[in-house]
Amino acid sequence: ADSIVPNAEDPTRVDVHMHIHEGEKYYVRDIHWVGNTVYPYEYLNRVLNIKKGDVYNLKELNKRLNEDDDALSKLYTDQGYLFFSVDPVEVNVENDSIDFEMRMYEGRQATINSINIKGNTRVYEHVVRRELYTKPGQLYSQSDIMRSLRELAQMGHFDQENLVPDIQPNPEEGTVDI
């Protein structure tokens, strides 16, 4: 049973003892992609890098879909698919195996409509724009935005913490203002 007991060496502390039952391990049996038209499922499987037979780990799955530097969502957002989303659904659980359906919405590619620079009082605007890897008329790219922020920070005129892009998507028009 779980317990909390006073620490024998330091009376201002307590020791917490917990019994944890992790449950059974589950394994990925199959991954089926739904809604993908831009990339073939073989390529998406390589990017996801979770294979049949791997131990199911929800945290790792979410990282591979959305958080890692080479995550699936980055693949799409770097090609203009700002409105992209993917929802992993457990469609079949049998014994210790899980079948997944990756339900994707690719959406249309977003074009940068405008880039507004606000709060700058130190540098001429054309100097700031010269450092940007994103320009109006280009496809949206998350990597290019991050690279632009790094370049602006390296100029030495701005606090990196204050360089925060305000991304305003317009799904109806397929554009984005930054």
Language-model segments: which ranges?
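Periplasmic polypeptide-binding modules associated with outer-membrane biogenesis and secretion
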Residues: 1-178
